[in-house]
Regions:
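Conserved small/polar residues in nucleotide/adenosyl-binding loops
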Residues: 201-208
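Long, amphipathic alpha-helical stalk/connector segments used for oligomerization, subunit docking
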Residues: 82-140
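Conserved beta-strand -> loop -> alpha-helix junction used to position metal-binding or nucleic-acid-contacting
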Residues: 45-73
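A conserved active-site cap/scaffold subdomain adjacent to cofactor or substrate pockets
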Residues: 64-88
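Short amphipathic alpha-helical "interface-anchor" segments enriched in bulky aromatics
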Residues: 38, 53-60, 155-172
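Catalytic phosphate/nucleotide-handling subdomain of diverse soluble enzymes
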Residues: 177-199
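RNase H-like nuclease fold core
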Residues: 1-32, 36-44
């Protein structure tokens, strides 16, 4: 299946309504961070929300100076989960084989991580960085479990995050698009160029 990149602009809004309108006919796996706008898809039978371990790691990573002991414990669970992915990559496993490996190795790790989050939360201040990190991560564990059973699902959505970075940098440099139509046009152009990069088209075109 070709990888396509799609940028969407809707009057500068990131509201839940924008996500619902955009994805009202979508069916399948929807991988995202913990942004509350996606909660609307939690109970849709034709959509499975998948979590992003990189976002969970980012929140726990931010606690290293405040509470190094707990932060390192949490990061160890996360690193072990990523190590399973590295193992699957090295073995060049099929989707089915990757899912089987995840269920055998990553499943127990995810269970242990969930238990650690549950047991650690009462030991920290809710308003502390660690308290907020755990409050972010714990509700997302059920969403993370979906990747255990389908090798096509990534453990995180870093590919989407990496595709977004050039757009963010461009936005900082340009400051403004000028008007809404210009912003919509920018989204179309970025979608086209981003998809070409995903398909390695621009590299071939440049070589020719």
């Amino acid at each position: 299946v070709p990888r396509l990149l799609f940028f969407h602009y809707d009057n500068g809004s990131r509201s839940q309504k924008v996500a619902i309108d955009l994805l009202k006919t979508f069916k399948g796996y929807l991988q995202c961070d913990g942004y509350s706008a996606y909660d609307a898809f939690e109970n849709r039978k034709d959509v499975r929300l998948c979590g992003c371990l990189a976002h969970i790691r980012r929140h726990i990573e931010s606690c290293r100076e405040e509470n190094r002991e707990y932060a390192m414990q949490g990061l160890k669970f996360i690193q072990d989960l990523y190590n399973v992915e590295y193992m699957a990559d090295e073995r060049q496993l099929s989707y089915e084989e990757r899912a089987a490996l995840r269920q055998r190795l990553a499943g127990p790790l995810l269970d242990a991580f969930e238990l650690w989050l549950q047991n650690t939360y009462p030991k920290v201040l809710k308003r502390s960085l660690m308290g907020k990190a755990i409050a972010y991560a714990y509700p997302l564990i059920p969403r993370m479990r979906h990747y255990l059973y389908d090798g096509r699902i990534f453990i995180d959505n870093n590919r989407a995050e990496n595709a977004l970075r050039p757009m963010v940098l461009t936005r900082k440099n340009m400051l403004f698009c000028g008007n809404r139509q210009a912003a919509e046009n920018t989204a179309v152009i970025c979608s086209l160029l981003g998809s070409c990069n995903c398909l390695l088209y621009t590299s071939d075109a440049a070589d020719e």
